[in-house]
């Protein structure tokens, strides 16, 4: 059986008060429309078409790596009109098409699979997703036959007294036999107060043709649409609970899961402990038995097993197993830190490689450098990598001892097994086995204060 999907992503989203199309706003680090696309793909649906409108180039930019096709809805004339705009996508296809909305990011791949299975096994012409709620005010009601089949969808304003008591509501997500859908679209009109073409009318047209219409009921959170910043925040809360619950089931400890913020694509190994206030973003992988103390942010990075991070920021970098980072360290993009290293407080590292067992304990800047293993950086060391026009490279070998308050003026090389005296400004290569001293000779002028009349009596 051939299955495909159409995702409606042309809405303007006026209530978002944004210059961006609504569907590219992110929930837990991923655009809403990409949540829907990815879950459709997880349900083994390969052919996906996005109906786009205002801000189409922005939507394309955010979805071009998803291998989808696009249909253009120049004017927003209703959900039915949006599907009409995708008729070319459905042309010459036979099978089943599901229709989802790009602003409902909480739909799961399990529900999508269930929708197709229910629709195809029951040989329905149309199947919709519904939900039961305590307060259905404002929603279209699902009215069923005695057999359980869907009889009709009635908008709230059109409900009679009995229909108002129904608490099963329409989600706006459907599954259709492609041929039935295309035939029904031919009979769709905009004879209503809004002058729009409604997809709900296709259900009525299908039913009048004598075809079967079914519905599956899912939790309300799965059909939540996002039309405002408030609803975006509500969707974020639901998604965050799902993400954190998944990690806890997989063996991750959260000291306070409600104040821990993890993006949907993050991977975390078991026996890792995460303290409140941590933010883990993007395509980050954290291996087993790590400890992330409060107020740490990690983005698009790989953290090895047994790493400890405390009150620090790690961006687009790799931290080797057994290393400690922080407190208050800043690991900038393209940094690779080896195993069992120590990156201490108020240390900034940028676009550098740090070898195994190297210690950079405090108040140090390292940029555009290659640092070997078993090195020690004293407090206040600075790699001076910028000459005013471009960044220069510094190379430090193994077993180098860099004394406190040292400036390494790039480009420069410090070879293996070297010592640099505290307070030195190094501008030339330091040979292996050497002690480098580059500071002014101390001069003591005895009695100077008394001669100047500065000695306090």
Curated annotation (Swiss-Prot):
GO terms for biological process: cell morphogenesis; cell wall organization; lipid A biosynthetic process; peptidoglycan biosynthetic process; regulation of cell shape; UDP-N-acetylglucosamine biosynthetic process. Acetyl-CoA binds at residues 385-386, 422, 439. Its EC number is 2.7.7.23, 2.3.1.157. Pathway: Nucleotide-sugar biosynthesis; UDP-N-acetyl-alpha-D-glucosamine biosynthesis; N-acetyl-alpha-D-glucosamine 1-phosphate from alpha-D-glucosamine 6-phosphate (route II): step 2/2; Nucleotide-sugar biosynthesis; UDP-N-acetyl-alpha-D-glucosamine biosynthesis; UDP-N-acetyl-alpha-D-glucosamine from N-acetyl-alpha-D-glucosamine 1-phosphate: step 1/1; Bacterial outer membrane biogenesis; LPS lipid A biosynthesis. It is found in: Cytoplasm. InterPro entries: Bifunctional_GlmU, GlmU-like, GlmU_C_LbH, Hexapep, NTP_transferase_dom, Nucleotide-diphossugar_trans, Trimer_LpxA-like_sf. One of its GO terms (molecular function) is magnesium ion binding. Residues 251-457 are annotated as: N-acetyltransferase. Mg(2+) binds at residues 103, 227. UDP-N-acetyl-alpha-D-glucosamine binds at residues 8-11, 22, 73, 78-79, 140, 155, 170, 227, 332, 350, 365, 376. Gene3D superfamilies: Hexapeptide repeat proteins (2.160.10.10), Spore Coat Polysaccharide Biosynthesis Protein SpsA, Chain A (3.90.550.10). The keyword Cytoplasm applies. Its cofactor is Mg(2+). It catalyses: alpha-D-glucosamine 1-phosphate + acetyl-CoA = N-acetyl-alpha-D-glucosamine 1-phosphate + CoA + H(+); N-acetyl-alpha-D-glucosamine 1-phosphate + UTP + H(+) = UDP-N-acetyl-alpha-D-glucosamine + diphosphate. PANTHER family: BIFUNCTIONAL PROTEIN GLMU (PTHR43584:SF3), NUCLEOTIDYL TRANSFERASE (PTHR43584). NCBIfam families: glmU (TIGR01173), PRK14354.1 (NF010934). In the N-terminal section; belongs to the N-acetylglucosamine-1-phosphate uridyltransferase family. Homotrimer. This is Bifunctional protein GlmU. The lineage of its organism: Bacteria, Bacillati, Bacillota, Clostridia, Eubacteriales.
